[in-house]
Amino acid sequence: MEKAAFESRAVLFGNVFGENVLVTNNRLLPGAPTMEIREVRENKKQFLELLLLADEEEAMIDRYLGRGTMYVLEDDGVKSECVVTDEGDGVLEIKNIATVPKHQGKGYARALIEHLTETYRGRFTVLRVGTGESPATLPFYERLGFVRTRRIKNFFIDHYPHPIVEAGVRLVDMIVLERRL
C-alpha cells in the first residue's frame, strides 16, 4: 500500500474501560497497541474485497465510491473500512462500512464511526446510514445512538439482481437510521 494514497490520520490506542480511545493530539500511552485510521484518496478499489462485504454489488459500490470519502482502519493490517458521502443539508451518509469477518466484534467499526463523529462534527449535523432489516446490523447502530427514521420499501429487491441474505434473513426493505453529530 502506497503512503501517497493516504491523507489524514488519527491514532487510536488500546482499551480503556473496554473502549477503543481516539487520540487526536497524537500522544500514545507507553506500550499501548496502536491502530490508525487513514483517509484513502487514490486507488480505493484496492479494498474492493472488503467493500463487497457490506455491499455485494460492485455496480452499486461504483455509484458512490468516486464521490465518497474513504477511511481504512489499520491494526497490523487493514481490519475495517468505511465510505461516507455528503448528501447535502448537513447530512453525512455512511454508504459502506465493513470489517474483516474474523476481526468483527472487536470495536473496529465502532472506532470508525466515532472517528467520523469527531472529524465531521461542526461541518455536518446528521450522520445517516441505510441498512437491511438484519439482526446483525440494526442493534449495532442502535447501540451507537442511531435511531430509525424511515423505511425504503423493496430497496434490496429493486436495486439488486439477486436476493441479499444477511444473518439468515433475506433483506427486502432498507432501514434508514440517523445520529446527531
Segments predicted by a language model, with ranges:
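Acetyl-CoA-dependent GNAT
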Residues: 38-101, 113, 180
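Conserved N-terminal entry element of GNAT/NAT acetyltransferase domains
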Residues: 15, 19-43, 175, 181
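Conserved catalytic-core motifs of GNAT/GCN5-like acyltransferases
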Residues: 128-130, 142, 147-170
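Positively charged N-terminal leader segments that act as targeting/secretion signals
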Residues: 1-12
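Conserved GNAT acetyl-CoA-binding A-motif
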Residues: 120-133
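Conserved acetyl-CoA pyrophosphate-binding loop and the N-cap/start of the following alpha-helix
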Residues: 103, 107-115
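Short hydrophobic/aromatic beta-strand or adjacent loop that forms the aromatic wall/cage
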Residues: 68, 171-176
